[in-house]
């Protein structure tokens, strides 16, 4: 969901599972319905997708939607008083959380909501996280909240409960990531003596929680696109294969090129974008969005997506926009992208519920249409089926994933460059990177989360590992 980069060590997640917390009774979920038809409530019948009858969900049409909640909470003074009351309730808890009593857990979450008073929410949320020794990073914006936090389960659940006391933020989309037993076994700072119960091997290497104020919780750069008003149809992992195997469906990977390079779904289109804000222009160019009368002229050749042609034969009926199925790592980018496509005239827009991570967790490898590894924004760098840690490492010069083969390339220099950034860096930039790397290796005093810490051991290259094994066998 939310990207958290730092200078030297990315944070860590382990086994991911989706928290399926249903909305309160009689409340309206902005993600229900769409194209999934179930004939029973609470039964065991499998929901059936009816793709041709899919309709985008319009939140504004529901009397109990979040927009109605916003109207009810429009008084800024009342909102601030409500926040202060909730914050005071938590501040009355004077005892410290004994972080020795529970295992660490990481939860990524987001919610699109009309949240103009987001700035007033920053201080009480940050104070609570620090009080409960919850680390991580959170973004607040007029369009909602997006974050990833780490702490013992009790503390993390208290923070999430605090956030959802605001009716507009209730029903967070959550992905839980318990720390693996291996990471827990080597965790040095999971004790009450640690400021945030986060030591050298903690998933997040921050000395405090970062709560930032931004214009968007995920940057697209088009204010008129609002997932609050309408989004596409969510498709569960178990139904995803059926959808993307349909020859009439165009599958689009909404992630960036450094992510798609190491893995994607079979037959998926790669926009080759370097940032999510580039996605709108790619859609406009590739689908040749040009209105002719009341119909959109566009032709998508799935065999070669780069070739999009227009039929000049007036006798042939104009082609309409195709059915779209999109996916990303955890779901937030797809949700906003689906709103964009609906605003551009696309009628059938689907996206993978829970993202790639949920798919890799639930779908057996023998039935999977996923190829390669999935890039993640944490210390694992990549994951495979079953969410097992992947084989990729991270280039600290450009924050891109690199393979063992990439580390054998002449362009690779630890902490400086890799085959993907070597030609893009000037010699001056490389020298500065070498100086920083030397300073870090000798003193560990580079600013940020690793300031004052001794550096980790420089990883051996695959060649060195092979030589070491050969030497030990002689």
UniProtKB/Swiss-Prot annotation:
Highest taxon listed in the record's lineage: Eukaryota
UniProt domain Rhodanese: residue ranges: 245-368
Gene3D superfamilies: 3.30.70.100, Rhodanese-like domain
Disulphide bridges: none
Any single Pfam family the record assigns to this protein: UPF0176_N
HAMAP family: TrhO
Protein known as: Rhodanese-like domain-containing protein 7
């Amino acid at each position: 969901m939310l990207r958290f980069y730092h200078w030297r060590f990315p944070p860590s997640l382990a086994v991911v599972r989706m928290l399926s917390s249903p909305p309160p009774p009689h409340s309206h979920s902005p993600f229900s319905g769409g194209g999934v038809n179930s004939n029973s409530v609470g039964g065991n019948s499998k929901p059936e997708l009816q793709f041709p009858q899919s309709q985008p969900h319009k939140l504004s049409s529901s009397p109990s939607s979040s927009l109605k909640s916003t109207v009810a909470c429009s008084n800024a003074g009342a909102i601030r008083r409500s926040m202060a009351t909730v914050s005071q309730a938590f501040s009355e808890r004077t005892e410290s959380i004994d972080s020795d009593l529970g295992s660490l857990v990481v939860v990524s979450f987001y919610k699109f909501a009309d949240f103009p008073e987001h700035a007033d929410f920053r201080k009480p949320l940050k104070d609570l996280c620090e009080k409960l020794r919850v680390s991580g990073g959170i973004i607040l914006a007029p369009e909602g909240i997006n974050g990833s936090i780490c702490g013992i389960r009790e503390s993390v659940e208290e923070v999430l409960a605090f956030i959802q006391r605001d009716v507009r933020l209730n029903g967070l989309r959550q992905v839980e990531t318990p720390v693996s037993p291996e990471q827990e076994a080597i965790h040095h700072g999971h004790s009450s003596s640690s400021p945030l119960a986060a030591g050298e091997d903690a998933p997040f290497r921050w000395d405090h929680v970062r709560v930032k104020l931004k214009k968007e919780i995920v940057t697209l750069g088009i204010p008129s696109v609002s997932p609050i008003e309408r989004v596409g149809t969510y498709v569960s992992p178990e139904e995803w294969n059926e959808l993307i195997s349909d020859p009439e469906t165009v599958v689009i990977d909404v992630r960036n090129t450094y992510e798609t390079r190491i893995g994607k779904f079979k037959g998926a289109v790669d926009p080759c974008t370097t940032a999510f804000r580039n996605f709108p222009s790619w859609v406009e160019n590739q689908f040749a969005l040009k209105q002719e009368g009341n119909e959109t002229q566009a032709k998508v050749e799935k065999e070669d997506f780069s070739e999009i042609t227009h039929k000049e034969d007036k006798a042939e009926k104009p082609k309409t926009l195709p059915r779209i199925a999109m996916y990303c790592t955890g779901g937030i980018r797809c949700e906003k992208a689906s709103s964009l496509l609906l605003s551009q005239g696309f009628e059938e827009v689907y996206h993978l519920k829970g993202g790639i991570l949920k798919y890799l967790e639930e779908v057996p490898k023998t039935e999977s249409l996923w190829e390669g590894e999935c890039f993640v924004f944490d210390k694992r760098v990549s994951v495979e089926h079953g969410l097992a840690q992947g084989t990729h490492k991270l280039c600290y010069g450009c924050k891109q994933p690199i393979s063992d083969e990439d580390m054998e390339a002449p362009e690779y220099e630890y902490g400086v460059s890799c085959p993907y950034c070597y030609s893009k860096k000037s010699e001056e930039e490389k020298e500065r990177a070498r100086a920083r790397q030397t300073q870090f290796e000798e003193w560990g005093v580079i600013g940020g989360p690793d300031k004052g810490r001794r550096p980790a051991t420089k990883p051996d290259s695959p060649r060195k590992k092979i030589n070491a094994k050969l030497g030990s066998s002689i």
